[in-house]
């Protein structure tokens, strides 16, 4: 079993854990409808970058 040779300082411990925390997903607002959606994804209304790309049930 591996055993460390020297104690890891609090600074180095923090640097090691720096990428462990979750980040929020990038959110975009559709210019046409004002709908909130994930970036590079179609909005719930079927719009992508100001154009209607998917037919929805309401159409």
From Swiss-Prot:
One MF term in the entry's GO annotations: structural constituent of ribosome
Region (Disordered) residue ranges read: 1-24
Write the record's keywords in alphabetical order, separated by commas. Ribonucleoprotein, Ribosomal protein
Task: Enumerate the Gene Ontology biological process terms.
Answer: translation
Organism domain of life: Bacteria
Pfam families according to UniProt: Ribosomal_L32p
One GO location term (cellular component)? large ribosomal subunit
InterPro entries, sorted: Ribosomal_bL32, Ribosomal_bL32_bact, Ribosomal_zn-bd
Query: Into which family does the record put it?
Result: Belongs to the bacterial ribosomal protein bL32 family.
What is the name of this protein? Answer: Large ribosomal subunit protein bL32
Origin organism is Ralstonia nicotianae (strain ATCC BAA-1114 / GMI1000) (Ralstonia solanacearum)
């Amino acid at each position: 079993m591996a055993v460390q040779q020297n104690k890891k300082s609090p600074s180095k411990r923090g640097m090691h854990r720096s990428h462990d925390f979750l980040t929020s997903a990038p959110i975009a607002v559709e210019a046409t409808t004002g709908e909130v959606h994930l970036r590079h994804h179609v909005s719930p209304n079927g719009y992508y970058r100001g154009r209607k790309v998917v037919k929805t049930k309401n159409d």
